[in-house]
Amino acid sequence: MRLKDKVAIITGGSRGIGYATADKFLKEGATVILTASSQGSADKAVAQLKEKYPDATVAGISPNLSNLESVRNAFREAASKYGCIDILVNNAGVSE
């Protein structure tokens, strides 16, 4: 439980390296907010992680990471709900 009482945001957390990172952080006791390109993808990943870690706190959001105001709003909401953001994993890629 090395990450107990820590809050992490993981961009691109619904699959691949981001999902694996979320899984590891939850195993270590962190609260995890993962981002995905769609709310459906975020919800699916959250459901899978909650099934594996039923007592963990994990949430999914889908801000537009190519829009600074969308990112700011998402991070403000996360900080308001979960407190200080201790860890940020910038894993998502953005293409136009």
PLM-predicted stretches and their roles:
Residues 7-10, 88-89:
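Conserved hydrophobic beta-strands of the Rossmann-like cofactor-binding core
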Residues 52-57, 76-90, 96:
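A glycine-rich helix->loop->beta "capping" turn
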Residues 39-40, 62-76:
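The beta1-alpha1 cofactor-binding region of Rossmann-like NAD(H)/NADP(H)-dependent oxidoreductases
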Residues 51-67:
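Rossmann-fold cofactor-recognition segment
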Residues 7, 14-16, 38:
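Conserved glycine-rich cofactor-binding loop
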Residues 28-45:
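Conserved glycine-rich Rossmann-like NAD(P)H-binding loop of the short-chain dehydrogenase/reductase
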Residues 16, 20, 95:
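NAD(P)H-binding Rossmann-fold N-terminus in SDR/SDR-like oxidoreductases
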Residues 25:
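Aromatic pocket-lining residues of Rossmann-like dinucleotide-binding sites
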